Amino acid sequence: MTMSMYSTTDKMKMSAPSCFPGRYSPSYRSSEQMRRCMPNPSIHISSSCDSLESRLLEDASLLCNSWSARQNGDIFAGINDGILSRAEALAAVDIQKHQAQHVHSQMPSQIKHDVMYHHHSMSGPPQRPLQENPFSRQMHHSMDQLDMLDPTGSMTTLAPISESPLTPTHQHLHGSYHSMNHMMSHHHPGTLSGHTGGHHGHSAVHHPVITAAVAAAGLHPDTDTDPRELEAFAERFKQRRIKLGVTQADVGKALANLKLPGVGALSQSTICRFESLTLSHNNMIALKPILQAWLEEAEAQAKNKRRDPDAPSVLPAGEKKRKRTSIAAPEKRSLEAYFAVQPRPSGEKIAAIAEKLDLKKNVVRVWFCNQRQKQKRIVSSVTPSMTGHGSAGFGY
């Protein structure tokens, strides 16, 4: 018996060193002490998750074999089996934890690479490799620097980059963008210009004669004229034109009488569009000095009431207003007597009456016409009053 105990003790001493201090140690140990017994799993981590799992399982199996009751002849085999089951469970937990850390460490970089590939694929298939373009090389280099960030903090540090001050790399990128825009503005000025500029360049084609005429006349228009100034002048021009009694068509025709080099007659629609501000900005600027010159000349002629035969007339040549014809009392009584006999005389009768009274034929004809209208108004004013008295007599 003593011999067998001694041999058992020798076997215990020759076995693997224990992580517990004594033979009759308690059956429960904390997880930290169990981890001290196990080899450090981080030493066995490799690039592949499968090799990591296989090595950890192998270490766990070696630990179980070292604590097997069959090898060291432990009499507390049941207690050791419980401890070994706890150790295996902790090892499995560690394996799952390292797998999760390994997966999370690979996800951000994988996402960033996918974003880069999708960014290049959306813009179409590249005609040349990215390395041939220095601009794309620099962008790729900046993305590689982002990939070198901490995987766990890369998703949070990417967002504030746009809010932070520009780094030298970003400043260089913005400088490249500005240079590209400058180059595009030289090659395609109409594409990068605003809506107003494009509209002006297009609408200037409609009336190129106006701009050429203004340049030939030496009326150098101010290209920086404020639109509000043009609007005020158009309204003032319209009011003064109406006050002078001149139509838009008359203004268009009278522009040819200004004798300005290259300035001819314009259509009524052009003057109308100027007053309604529907012309383009460039055409409004070109037409303003011409209309201003006409307005000053027209107001001067209307004020002076004189027409110089050598000076051009910018106002329409209207007929002189006919004076009102006054008929003397004796002729008037004779006409009334003729009207009482025949309210509608013939043309020959009107000519005979005019010759007898020494009046113009047209004057006699107009007098008979006016007298008929006067009698008609008198009759129409008397008839309703008579109808009213008649209806009242019947009691209606």
Swiss-Prot record:
Natural source organism: Drosophila melanogaster
Protein name as catalogued: Inhibitory POU protein
Tissue and organ expression note: Coexpressed with vvl in overlapping subsets of neurons in the embryonic central nervous system. Expressed in olfactory neurons.
SMART domains referenced in this protein's UniProt entry, alphabetically: HOX, POU
Keywords, comma-separated and alphabetical: Activator, DNA-binding, Homeobox, Nucleus, Olfaction, Repressor, Sensory transduction, Transcription, Transcription regulation
Molecular function GO labels: DNA-binding transcription factor activity; DNA-binding transcription factor activity, RNA polymerase II-specific; RNA polymerase II cis-regulatory region sequence-specific DNA binding; transcription corepressor activity
Domain of life: Eukaryota
Ranges where the POU-specific domain occurs: 222-299
